[in-house]
């Protein structure tokens, strides 16, 4: 199977977690797009759900596929969020944000009773960090924020190049919230919860791509089939 076929297989399995009447968080990225498309097929067959999109791109996909939408202002909770991931550790802590939607993705995930991450099995890693860690920042004071990030990385025992993400036009990539993204090429993050706390304390940092304690289940598609991993007992 191709990588896209594996992503679609993981998305199809995630549909088994969806029940009639659910309020859903709809993730962003290529794997989440497969889920939205398959969900649309179920909706056309009579499934009643509403979704909260995590990006303008996902909103457009959901509207195209006929998935009814709502907002977090109009519902008091979400039953389930299904989203992709850039890296998944055995703890089910993940790195997300390669598509630039990490702020809305984290807000939606935190508002959900359950978060399921879906991917092909190449995203499964023993230690997070090979994928660049996205940090969403306010454009104002960028130099000061970069210096504070470097200090936080050193305190967490990691180091690496910090680059400003660029869009197709060669200018700074702008998120749906009007912010910029710094990508930290760290290689390895031995203590993700500690680094997450340090990053969250930096003025100028809006959000970061470490999703700690949010995912409850991972669905991984590989050449040997589907593997389902639940968060280890004792983890928050």
From Swiss-Prot:
Entries under Gene3D superfamilies matching the protein: 3.30.70.260, 3.40.50.1360
Active site, per annotation: 105 (proton acceptor)
SUPFAM superfamilies recorded: D-ribose-5-phosphate isomerase (RpiA), lid domain, NagB/RpiA/CoA transferase-like
GO biological-process terms attached to the record: pentose-phosphate shunt, non-oxidative branch
Involved pathway(s): Carbohydrate degradation; pentose phosphate pathway; D-ribose 5-phosphate from D-ribulose 5-phosphate (non-oxidative stage): step 1/1
Binding site for substrate: 28-31, 83-86, 96-99, 123
Keywords: Isomerase
Protein's job: Catalyzes the reversible conversion of ribose-5-phosphate to ribulose 5-phosphate.
Protein family (similarity comment): Belongs to the ribose 5-phosphate isomerase family.
Quaternary structure and partners: Homodimer.
Record-given protein name: Ribose-5-phosphate isomerase A
